[in-house]
Amino acid sequence: MTKYIFVTGGVVSSIGKGITAASLGRLLKNRGLSVTIQKFDPYINVDPGTMSPYQHGEVYVTDDGAETDLDLGHYERFIDINLNKYSNVTTGKVYSEVIKKERRGDYLGGTVQVIPHITNELKDRVFRAARMTNSDIIITEIGGTVGDIESLPFLEAIRQIKGDVGAENVLYIHTTLIPYIKAAGEMKTKPTQHSVKELRSLGIQPNIIVVRTEQPVSQEMKDKIALFCDIKASEVIESRDEETLYNVPLSLQKQKMDDIVLEHLQLEAPQAEMTDWKNLVHRVKNLSKKVRIGLVGKYVSLQDAYLSVAEALRHAGYDHDAEIEIDWIDSEKVTKENVAEIMKDVDGILVPGGFGDRAIEGKIAAIEYARVNKVPYFGICLGMQLATVEFARNVLGLEGAHSAEIEPETNHNIIDLLPEQKNIENMGGTLRLGLYPARIKQGTKAEAAYGTTLVEERHRHRYEFNNEYREQMEEAGMIVSATSPDGRLVEVVELIDHPWFVACQYHPEFISRPNRPQSLFKDFVGAALKNK
């Protein structure tokens, strides 16, 4: 019988529900249990694919091509599992499905309502994930904050699941904030009490309360929360700000959170073997070297827009015993005139993915600087496309060379629409998405990084390198080092006469893990260290 854990949040959003859920998943997996995890987002968008990064942070892509919430990246990195489209559910998806069923006549002429039709669809998404994975435990994080009107159908659905599968098979975890009032020198539990009161008014009694705090939570305070929220003091779990996120599972284990969960769910499992994880955390806290990477993007004011890229850099750093210092460089402020001054202290330059024409020339200036000055360069998606544009302009001498995405009327469309994209009108869900194979050319930097000639990586793009320019590029020193297996689509380019200049069309950051860094990131950081 599958067991169900639901993680809700109160007081404020962005208090670490995703990290809590992912950390618990790691502990349970290390106890020998099979775990899957999903995120319910109450917004009406079908997915975050067309949302601004300023609104949502990065869009995380799964193997099967789902454009999902960035929390799925935390889940995959912590638990080391590959999720799918059933792991991210939005109000938009649910309502779309219910309306489709109504139009098809599935409801036999009945009045379609939030209860039971929307709530049943939500429950089905939980049960479907359980059926598909046959997991011992499924963890479901409910986005937003208790009290939000958008969350009500989700909370009602998870309330009903307890009745559907039995109380012994369901556990509710509520994550709240205990604010520290500096002027008074006190921490306040009242917001937590009110948040739990709101949750209980909806029919959900939390079994565990995780309190986010900057200061230590005293036993007296835990007793007070337990009294007012009708749980044991041992079921109040402190979640402090950590030096590294990867210490959170160890902190939860120290407070026996996994034991409490298994006791509630009437499960028996051996203690979690966390030696490898402890070694990872020890390594992270005791890195002996430093390397500075200039990350050049247009969304750098919200670093969550590049969350997986930053994490993949850090993972590579762990492998090299190096702390990664990321210099967040706004490409809108980079020009040919000031690029040397901006880049003077960086050991490597990375241009990540992106869309649209804003701040493109700043990225191209950064790429030219890396190429000319032999600074290690790593381009991802748009970062690859602009590397070929820069090379076409400044090495091949093709005046006005550009991407058709940015300049549709260019005489030299180095980057053009994929043929299958030319008649597509809708933006959402229509990119080339998900895991695709790439064949790597022998004797290249890409092959040296991967140690193999066939890899699979996750993609998210609509435009592709124009093969009309391939021969000309290669003759001038920018070679195609990986393509799709049929040789049609360019996947990786690199410079022959450069210490490390590699750019890929796919998004390698999505498969990086803290204890298993992605190969190109690992090689790039190694090259940056040599450049110090």
Swiss-Prot record:
This is CTP synthase. SUPFAM superfamilies: Class I glutamine amidotransferase-like (SSF52317), P-loop containing nucleoside triphosphate hydrolases (SSF52540). Gene3D superfamilies: 3.40.50.880, P-loop containing nucleotide triphosphate hydrolases. Residues 292-532 form the Glutamine amidotransferase type-1 domain. It holds the Pfam family GATase. Residues 1-267 are annotated as: Amidoligase domain. Keywords: ATP-binding, Glutamine amidotransferase, Ligase, Magnesium, Metal-binding, Nucleotide-binding, Pyrimidine biosynthesis. ATP binds at S14, I15, G16, K17, G18, I19, D71. The gene is pyrG. The lineage of its organism: Bacteria, Bacillati, Bacillota, Bacilli, Bacillales. CTPSs have evolved a hybrid strategy for distinguishing between UTP and CTP. The overlapping regions of the product feedback inhibitory and substrate sites recognize a common feature in both compounds, the triphosphate moiety. To differentiate isosteric substrate and product pyrimidine rings, an additional pocket far from the expected kinase/ligase catalytic site, specifically recognizes the cytosine and ribose portions of the product inhibitor. PANTHER family: CTP SYNTHASE, CTP SYNTHASE-RELATED. Catalyzes the ATP-dependent amination of UTP to CTP with either L-glutamine or ammonia as the source of nitrogen. Regulates intracellular CTP levels through interactions with the four ribonucleotide triphosphates.
